[in-house]
Amino acid sequence: PGNATRVLDAQGRTQPPGVRGELVGRSATMMPGSFRNEEADAAFYWRDADGVLFHRTGDIGMFDEDGFLVLLDRRKDLIISGGFNIYASDLEEKLLAHPDVADAAVIAIPSEKWGETPLGLVVPKPGRTLDAEELLSWVNAQLGRTQRISSIELRDELPRSNVGKVLKQELRKPYWEGHR
């Protein structure tokens, strides 16, 4: 009792099961906002039509048909290219399905035409040789036209945190210096 989770679209409308969106949550013990910081409140909180305060989690998810919450991605990893939302995790899943790929991350990089565009960063399996252009053709053949990866860079490894998460902010940084 007193707890709630919702999935919202970009306009703040609650989404039905099976539809992705930003996760917001509330509980009876949640603080009522930031102390004297309305700007922070605008970024981290959302109010429903009844004025009930919810915390923005920064996660993308959905409820499945059985009512279970499924976490899919982080909002900061969402790529908005030409007005289309592209989920990095969807593209990473496709890249990792290739038999010669050991690890993969997809990040947004600047694009003059689209605003942002997906870049695949791929680590080949030990002893395997990958051709970036061939892999790009292979993965894009499995994706919708608006989801396609612009290019692929091969790496020896991807930077990871102490708990094993790929440090996407570190990967994005050199591409965005001088932008935004």
Predicted regions and their residues:
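AMP-binding/adenylate-forming catalytic core of the ANL superfamily
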Residues: 5, 25-27, 32-33, 51-53, ...
